[in-house]
A protein has these predicted regions:
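Short beta-strand segments at enzyme active-site cores
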Residues: 116-123, 235
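Oxyanion-hole/transition-state-stabilizing segment in secreted/luminal serine hydrolases
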Residues: 76-84
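Short hydrophobic beta-strand that contains or immediately precedes a catalytic carboxylate
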Residues: 72-74
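A short alpha/beta connector and helix-capping loop motif
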Residues: 85-111, 116-117
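N-terminal signal peptide c-region/cleavage motif recognized by signal peptidases
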Residues: 37-40
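Active-site-adjacent betaalpha module
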Residues: 2-27, 42-70, 79, 110-114, ...
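Surface-exposed, active-site-proximal loop segments in enzymatic domains
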Residues: 83-92, 133-134, 225
Length: 278
């Protein structure tokens, strides 16, 4: 586990963590991407993310009532979505392929323009989170590279423009004193933060889900919200995931989105639905 000093989001620490991921996970991601590219060259008609030509599952019938709908964006933070972030070596190719950063901007803008409730579920780690006695594989990696590090829950020192901060282009939408900023989740799902409470207190029971990363926090939020009685649509190109030798996180998530979400939409489809008030 890193020492307390590794929790400081200084330039040297960030560069060191980025170099770790660049030399390790980033290289693995490049190999995996190269493999996909080679396969695509041999069979250009195959898109692993394309919808099936003959689906067996029944189509979605979800219709938004914007008075009880919220756009929920998970982890719209620098460490996931910026080339400056420590996870970029693993997720960057997927983020770029799906145009995730720009698509999230479109969703924020559409929701705000149409007075749709917006909530953010962020991911933060404090020095006291570094002493956990057991962790899953991705937890170990996140802590090793210093992902989402903050010095304290009560101090903003070193936070602005750090990997834990929100992406700059989203701040106008998030920091408007209207967006619900839930308390941080710690692993993947919202079970340990106040997102569900905030949604229920605002009489929200329909959720449009987007953010990072697809097979981890987004899928975990999806499952928890469904189990909690919410109707949930996932925006398939407003998320992304790591591509590693262990697997393509985006493809894994997309499969489960199709199986369990109430709807799976593109950003274009979602913007149109968010703009259909009245």
């Amino acid at each position: 586990m890193p020492s307390d000093s590794s929790a400081k989001p200084g330039a040297a620490g960030i560069n060191g963590r980025r170099n770790f991921l660049t030399s390790g996970a980033a290289a693995a991601a490049a190999l995996a991407t190269a493999g996909v590219a080679t396969h695509a060259a041999a069979a250009p008609a195959i898109n692993p993310y394309a919808d099936p030509a003959k689906p067996m599952l029944p189509p979605s019938t979800m219709q938004l009532d914007l008075s009880r709908t919220a756009l929920v964006v998970i982890d719209p933070q620098v460490d996931f979505l910026s080339p400056k972030g420590v996870a970029w070596g693993a997720v960057g190719a997927s983020v770029q392929q799906h145009n995730t950063v720009e698509n999230l901007s479109r969703l924020f803008a559409a929701a705000k323009a149409n007075d749709v409730t917006v909530a953010v579920s962020p991911h933060h780690y404090y020095p006291t989170d570094k002493g956990w006695k057991f962790e899953g594989a991705l937890e170990k990696l996140m802590h090793k590279i210093g992902m989402f590090n903050r010095l304290s829950p009560y101090s903003m020192e070193g936070f602005e423009n750090s990997g834990a901060d929100f992406m700059p282009q989203y701040k106008q939408h998030i920091l408007d004193n209207k967006t619900i900023i839930a308390s941080p989740h710690k692993v993947y799902g919202p079970e340990q933060n106040d997102l569900v409470l905030q949604l229920r207190k605002n009489r929200i029971d329909q959720v449009v889900l987007a953010g990072m990363s697809a097979n981890l926090c987004v899928e975990s939020h999806l499952r928890a919200l469904l189990e909690g009685g919410f109707e949930v649509a996932v925006v398939r190109d407003a998320t992304a995931a790591a591509i590693l030798p262990e697997g393509d996180g985006y493809l894994a998530a997309l499969t489960n989105f199709r199986f369990i979400a109430n709807a799976v939409w593109t950003t274009g489809e979602t913007v149109a639905r968010l703009s259909a008030r009245g």
